[in-house]
């Protein structure tokens, strides 16, 4: 009798969802540069408007949700532990049930290609 998980994999009939999450850091090589980078290049909010929120703001980020082949959720924000870097996260969810693992590798490759293709081009366009 087998007591470990791999023995039970043969009994799984269907998976409910599949997701890929990629996280990367983009160094900007200057202290505190990440917040200024996003606020001055990606957002059209004036400093006096930010002041309406009160003191203590350390940075601002973007959250972009795209319904493409799966649901792409892209977060771009300062890495708050080191404000010289941007935190970039891509979470791609495929919320359709499926059986079998064929096609999973292609979805993983597509998420990687999106991150290092379209997301990279988007960030480069902000410079």
Where do the model's predicted regions map?
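Aromatic- and glycine-enriched beta-alpha-beta binding-site module
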Residues: 1-22
């Amino acid at each position: 009798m087998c007591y470990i998980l791999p023995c039970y994999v043969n009994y799984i009939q269907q998976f409910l969802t599949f997701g890929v999450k990629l996280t990367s850091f983009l160094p900007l090589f200057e202290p505190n540069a990440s917040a200024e980078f996003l606020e001055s290049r990606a957002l059209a909010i004036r400093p006096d408007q930010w002041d309406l929120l009160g003191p203590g703001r350390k940075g601002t980020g973007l959250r972009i949700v795209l319904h493409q082949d799966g649901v792409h959720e892209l977060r771009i924000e300062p890495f708050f532990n080191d404000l010289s870097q941007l935190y970039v996260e891509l979470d791609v969810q495929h919320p359709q049930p499926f059986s079998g693992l064929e096609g999973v590798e292609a979805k993983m490759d597509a998420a990687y290609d999106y991150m290092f293709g379209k997301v990279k081009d988007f960030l480069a366009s902000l410079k």
